[in-house]
Amino acid sequence: MANILAVDDNLELCKLIRTTLERDGHRVETRQAGGALTEALCRWADCILLDVMMPGEDGFAVCRRIRSLTE
Protein backbone atom coordinates (compact mmCIF):
# COMPACT_ATOMS: atom_id res chain seq x y z
CA MET A 1 0.00 0.00 0.00
CA ALA A 2 0.95 3.68 -0.02
CA ASN A 3 3.22 5.66 2.30
CA ILE A 4 1.18 8.70 3.34
CA LEU A 5 2.33 11.80 5.19
CA ALA A 6 -0.41 13.93 6.81
CA VAL A 7 0.35 17.41 8.17
CA ASP A 8 -2.28 19.18 10.27
CA ASP A 9 -2.11 21.38 13.38
CA ASN A 10 -5.10 19.56 14.91
CA LEU A 11 -3.88 16.52 16.88
CA GLU A 12 -7.31 14.85 16.88
CA LEU A 13 -7.59 15.16 13.11
CA CYS A 14 -4.09 13.67 12.72
CA LYS A 15 -5.19 10.69 14.81
CA LEU A 16 -8.37 10.27 12.75
CA ILE A 17 -6.44 10.41 9.46
CA ARG A 18 -3.89 7.87 10.74
CA THR A 19 -6.54 5.45 12.04
CA THR A 20 -8.65 5.62 8.89
CA LEU A 21 -5.77 5.18 6.45
CA GLU A 22 -3.97 2.48 8.46
CA ARG A 23 -7.23 0.50 8.60
CA ASP A 24 -7.06 0.43 4.79
CA GLY A 25 -3.50 -0.92 4.92
CA HIS A 26 -1.50 2.27 4.31
CA ARG A 27 1.61 3.31 6.22
CA VAL A 28 0.99 6.75 7.74
CA GLU A 29 3.23 9.37 9.35
CA THR A 30 1.69 12.51 10.84
CA ARG A 31 3.19 15.86 11.75
CA GLN A 32 1.50 18.78 13.48
CA ALA A 33 3.66 21.43 11.84
CA GLY A 34 5.18 21.83 8.42
CA GLY A 35 8.51 22.81 9.96
CA ALA A 36 8.98 19.22 11.16
CA LEU A 37 9.30 17.92 7.59
CA THR A 38 12.63 16.65 6.32
CA GLU A 39 13.78 15.82 2.82
CA ALA A 40 13.97 12.10 3.72
CA LEU A 41 10.39 12.08 5.00
CA CYS A 42 9.13 13.93 1.92
CA ARG A 43 10.89 11.46 -0.39
CA TRP A 44 9.46 8.50 1.62
CA ALA A 45 5.88 9.62 1.09
CA ASP A 46 3.87 8.55 -1.94
CA CYS A 47 1.17 11.05 -0.97
CA ILE A 48 1.27 14.14 1.27
CA LEU A 49 -1.92 15.57 2.80
CA LEU A 50 -1.58 19.20 3.94
CA ASP A 51 -3.84 21.45 5.99
CA VAL A 52 -3.84 24.74 4.08
CA MET A 53 -4.94 26.82 7.08
CA MET A 54 -2.28 26.04 9.70
CA PRO A 55 -0.98 28.88 11.89
CA GLY A 56 2.49 30.05 11.00
CA GLU A 57 3.51 28.14 7.89
CA ASP A 58 0.33 27.23 5.99
CA GLY A 59 -0.07 24.24 3.69
CA PHE A 60 0.72 26.25 0.56
CA ALA A 61 4.06 27.38 2.03
CA VAL A 62 4.81 23.81 3.14
CA CYS A 63 4.05 22.58 -0.38
CA ARG A 64 6.48 25.11 -1.88
CA ARG A 65 9.16 24.05 0.63
CA ILE A 66 8.62 20.35 -0.13
CA ARG A 67 9.01 21.05 -3.83
CA SER A 68 12.30 22.86 -3.20
CA LEU A 69 13.56 19.97 -1.02
CA THR A 70 12.81 17.31 -3.60
CA GLU A 71 13.96 19.06 -6.79
Task: Report residues per predicted region.
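Residue-level signal for the "D+5" position in two-component response regulator receiver
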Residues: T30, G56-E57
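The feature encodes the CheY-like receiver
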Residues: C14, P55
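Charged docking surfaces used in two-component/phosphorelay signaling
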Residues: K15-T19, R23
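Conserved phosphotransfer cores of two-component systems
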Residues: L41-W44, R65-E71
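Active-site residues of response regulator receiver
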Residues: D51
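Short hydrophobic/Thr-rich beta-strand motif most characteristic of the beta2 strand and flanking loop
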Residues: G25-A33, E39-A40
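Short acidic/polar segment at the start of the alpha1 helix of CheY-like receiver
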Residues: A6, N10-L13
